[in-house]
Regions:
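Short, charged/small-residue-rich alpha-helical element at the C-terminal edge
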Residues: 153-220
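ABC transporter nucleotide-binding domains
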Residues: 1-124, 129-143, 148-149
Length: 220
C-alpha cells in the first residue's frame, strides 16, 4: 500500500543476495549487531535480538567465531540473520543455497520453513527446482524476464491425465491381479511399476545420520 520508492517502506523488507559480502574479521555476533545498529537497534534490545537470531539460524555456538572461519553454509545463515534483524514482513532470498553442501542446504530450508510457520512471507529465487518444490506454497516460472506460469505447487506439478497409487507390502500376486483389472478395463493403460526412488540428497542425509549413530564420538 506504500510506494516502493519511500525509504520507510524498505524497513519492512529483508534481503539476502546470492553472494553476500561480510567483514571476515568480525564474529557472527558482531556482524548481526553491526547490521542491527544500522537499523536503529541498540542496548539490551539489540543484544536480545542478536541472541534470538543466532539461535534461529543455528549459529549460537559459533557466535564468537570470526566469519573468516565460517563455511559457505554458515555465511549464508549469518546472512539470513542480518536480513531478519529489523523484523521484516517480507524476506527476499536470492539463491540462498547456491554453493552450499547438502547438509547446509537442508539447514537453510529448515530455517525458511520455520519463518513460514511464524507467518513471515518469504520470496525465494532459485534455479534448484527440487528445493523450490519442497519449501514453496506458490511458484512463478520466469523465462527471459516474462512470467510464463504461476500457481500453487500442487497445481503446477499435478498431471491430471494420470493416477498414482502407492502400495506397501504388495505381493506379486496382488500386482498381477491389478494388471489384469487394468487390461479388462480397456481404457486405462498400465505405464510402469517398481520401487519408488529417493533423491540423492535424502540418501546423503540418511547415510550421514546412520554414520553419526554408529560414531557418536568421531574425534575420540
Amino acid at each position: 500500500g506504500r510506494s516502493s520508492l519511500a525509504p520507510d517502506s524498505k524497513e519492512e523488507v529483508g534481503f539476502l543476495p546470492e553472494n553476500p559480502y561480510f567483514y571476515k574479521f568480525l564474529t557472527g555476533a558482531e556482524t548481526v549487531s553491526f547490521y542491527g545498529r544500522l537499523c536503529g537497534l541498540s542496548g539490551k534490545s539489540l543484544k536480545a535480538k542478536v541472541r534470538e537470531l543466532l539461535e534461529l539460524v543455528g549459529l549460537a555456538d559459533a557466535a564468537d567465531r570470526r566469519l573468516g572461519g565460517y563455511s559457505k553454509g554458515m555465511l549464508q545463515r549469518i546472512g539470513m540473520a542480518q536480513a531478519l534483524v529489523q523484523s521484516p514482513r517480507l524476506l527476499v532470498l536470492d539463491e540462498p543455497t547456491a554453493g552450499v553442501d547438502p547438509l547446509g542446504s537442508r539447514d537453510i530450508r529448515n530455517i525458511i520453513e520455520n519463518l513460514k510457520g511464524r507467518g513471515m512471507t518469504v520470496f525465494l529465487c532459485s534455479h534448484l527446482l527440487e528445493q523450490v518444490q519442497e519449501v514453496c506454497d506458490r511458484v512463478g516460472v520466469i523465462f527471459k524476464g516474462l512470467l510464463i506460469a504461476e500457481g500453487s505447487v500442487n497445481e503446477l506439478t499435478r498431471d491430471s491425465d494420470k493416477q498414482e497409487i502407492l502400495l506397501e507390502h504388495a505381493s506379486p500376486e496382488l500386482m498381477e491381479r491389478l494388471k489384469e483389472m487394468v487390461k479388462e478395463d480397456g481404457r486405462a493403460v498400465w505405464l510402469e511399476d517398481g520401487h519408488p526412488r529417493n533423491s540423492l540428497e535424502s540418501v546423503f542425509l540418511k547415510s550421514l545420520l546412520e554414520w553419526k549413530e554408529k560414531h557418536p564420538n568421531p574425534e575420540s
